[in-house]
Amino acid sequence: MAGMKSARRSAEIHKAVAVLREAGVDAEIQFTASPGDGRRLATEATTSGCDLIIACGGDGTINEVINGIVPGNTPLAILPGGTANIAAKELGLPGNIVRAARQISACRPYRIPLGRATWEDSGITKQRYFLAVAGIGFDAHIISQLDVGMKLRMGVLAYIWEAVRQVFRYRYQAFQFTADSRATSSTFAVVQRSSRYAGWLRLARPHRVHDLGFSCCLFQGEGPGRYLLYAFGIVTQTHDRLHGVRLLSGSEIRCASDQPETSVYFELDGELAGRIPVTFEVVPDALTILAPESFSRTQQ
């Protein structure tokens, strides 16, 4: 579970644990205190033979836990407790922690694919899985500048505030975006394995977490004026009609630059990961996830 942020959240978590125990789940509670704890705790639970891992937190916490499980086979259940909660929404889970806990005993296991990012960091090859979204460029830069305390206090409003600040400061560096050998350029790209971005927005063509491949939205313009227009288009869901916006799909995505001074960040499930060049691919049959019966109907 992500560290308790308030008295209200503490009460919700303890009530959810009580619900699980009433349902016969012998739950051992572990709290995260710093980045990386979710991955470490999930790895320890997997290697110790735990039957089920229940992750309570936002998409970043879920991402850490997934990377602690895979390539193991321990099933994962989710209690939504973050800002965007894309993973929970994609699975059809209630938005309330306690209600989601009540549903766990009725959920079924499903095997789903995951996205995987591969990149170099100081000469070391790194890999990380992601469930829903990767962002390259502008949104990753926002995350790199975001004040953690403000995020905890304000939630999604902190992202909006930082986006407004950065739209006038960002350098809008172009990079090469290649989808299955089709190359183009972009200043901001979203690579989705989900139907949602930032919790409720829909940028790319419809995609579901159990589908193979990626659905991508590219923004190719530069400067504050163009990006403010993009923001208006995204909110009104007319962005795909704007000049410099492209919708693509592919099974392997590569983002790179031929300019050595280019420094473009990318994020995975809302958490800063690294800098380009980076390659995204899909790993089929990668994770066992618990979801309601309604999730099976979206697979048809």
Regions inferred by a protein language model and the residue ranges of each:
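A generic structural signal for short beta-strands and their flanking turns/coil linkers
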Residues: 171-173, 185-187, 210-214, 249-251
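Glycine-rich phosphate/pyrophosphate-binding beta-alpha loops
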Residues: 135, 139, 190-204, 272
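Gly/Ser/Thr-rich active-site loops/lids in small-molecule metabolic enzymes
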Residues: 150-158, 202-226
